[in-house]
């Protein structure tokens, strides 16, 4: 499904490639990111460059994403995380008020902790000045070490087997 196509609300599974580019800058392509809509859940796989913008272009507010899955930690799969995470908290991004679920291979905790440290002052100022709810920046982390296995640790009624 391309970004310009309307969604079929009767579909059980909709996959949208938000970015298929590489680390090399290309004005026509964003970096790696895939949106999966399944069983009324919005699942995001990787956060390449431009992911938040592509979500908005696809008609999805970043705050609508229920869970984020990192496949691995190459820059073209992660560089858009800060923009997506903090942008989903802002009113223009949907105003996230609940924690974001994030899963990934070993190392996901360090990735998230680094972002929390890097943006601590920004978060503090937005809470104080814009009265944004701090809960919208919270992240629930699940790490795994099994190669080729995808799962959603927060919703037991949705299994995501790798194929």
Where are these regions (language model features)?
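Binuclear metal-dependent hydrolase catalytic cores
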Residues: 1-163
């Amino acid at each position: 499904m391309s970004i310009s196509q309307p969604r079929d609300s009767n579909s059980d599974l909709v996959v949208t490639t938000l970015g298929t580019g590489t680390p090399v800058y290309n004005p026509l392509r964003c970096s790696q990111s895939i949106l999966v809509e399944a069983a009324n859940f919005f699942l995001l796989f990787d956060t390449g460059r431009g992911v938040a913008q592509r979500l908005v272009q696809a008609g999805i507010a970043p705050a609508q994403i229920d869970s984020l899955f990192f496949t691995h930690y190459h820059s073209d799969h992660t560089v858009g995380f800060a923009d997506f995470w903090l942008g989903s908290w802002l009113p223009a991004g949907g105003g996230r008020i609940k924690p974001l679920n994030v899963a990934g291979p070993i190392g996901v905790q360090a990735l998230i902790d680094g972002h929390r440290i890097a943006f601590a002052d920004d978060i503090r100022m937005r809470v104080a000045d814009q009265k944004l709810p701090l809960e919208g920046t919270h992240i629930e982390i699940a790490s795994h070490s099994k190669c080729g296995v995808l799962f959603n640790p927060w919703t037991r009624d949705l299994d995501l087997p790798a194929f």
